[in-house]
């Protein structure tokens, strides 16, 4: 939804879980791909062999971060949103970053300015231009927290919320 508001025309979503791909399509993805060994080739095919202008990696796995880098076009940006485990390392080839002028950057909490951005997002939501309610696919009580965690790990939900 946010990428659409920013003017993106082609949005390719990649995930291992069908529920998250369905949600991505509902929120504006033009193509959805099941994550596997052919993902990079599929992204290149969908982008006429260019690669993606922006890749947002939200898993936090160094292996996935490295694979995501290969889907970025020369001059494009890889934005690391997912938190990697403390002490883990991700290997990006410096010579390719330089020669292809790719950018790798981190984004914590959306790199937002809460005083400026939260009122903007609230206004977009209240105006009906930013759909948020559908992000939560299931709610849980505090007593159901273990089930919520299990559902999240197993990919049975897109997003869960604990209500207390």
Which residues does each predicted region cover?
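Mid-domain Rossmann-like dinucleotide-binding core that forms the NAD(H)/NADP(H) cofactor-binding site
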Residues: 1-37
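N-terminal Rossmann-like NAD(P) cofactor-binding module of classical short-chain dehydrogenase/reductase
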Residues: 56
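Rossmann-fold dehydrogenase core element
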Residues: 76-77, 92-134
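Local beta-strand N-terminus motif with an aromatic residue
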Residues: 29, 51-52, 132, 145
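Helix-to-beta-strand junctions that scaffold the AdoMet/dcAdoMet cofactor pocket
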Residues: 72-74
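C-terminal hydrophobic helical "lid"/dimerization subdomain
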Residues: 66-70, 115-164
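Short amphipathic alpha-helix with an adjacent loop that forms part of the alpha/beta core around
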Residues: 38-49
């Amino acid at each position: 939804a946010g990428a659409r508001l920013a003017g993106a025309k082609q949005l390719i979503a990649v995930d291992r879980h069908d529920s998250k791909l369905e949600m991505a399509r509902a929120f504006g993805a033009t193509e959805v791909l099941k994550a596997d060994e052919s993902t990079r080739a599929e992204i290149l095919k969908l982008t006429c062999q260019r690669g993606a202008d922006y890749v947002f990696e939200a898993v936090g796995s160094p292996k996935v971060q490295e694979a995501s880098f290969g889907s970025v076009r020369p001059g494009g940006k890889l934005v690391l949103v997912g938190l990697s485990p403390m002490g883990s390392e991700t290997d990006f080839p410096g010579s390719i970053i330089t020669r292809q002028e790719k950018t790798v950057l981190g984004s914590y909490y959306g790199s937002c300015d809460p005083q400026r951005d939260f009122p903007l997002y609230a206004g977009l939501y209240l105006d009906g231009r930013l759909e948020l309610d559908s992000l939560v696919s299931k709610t849980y009580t505090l007593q159901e927290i273990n089930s919520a965690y299990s559902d999240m790990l197993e990919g049975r939900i897109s997003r869960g919320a604990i209500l207390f």
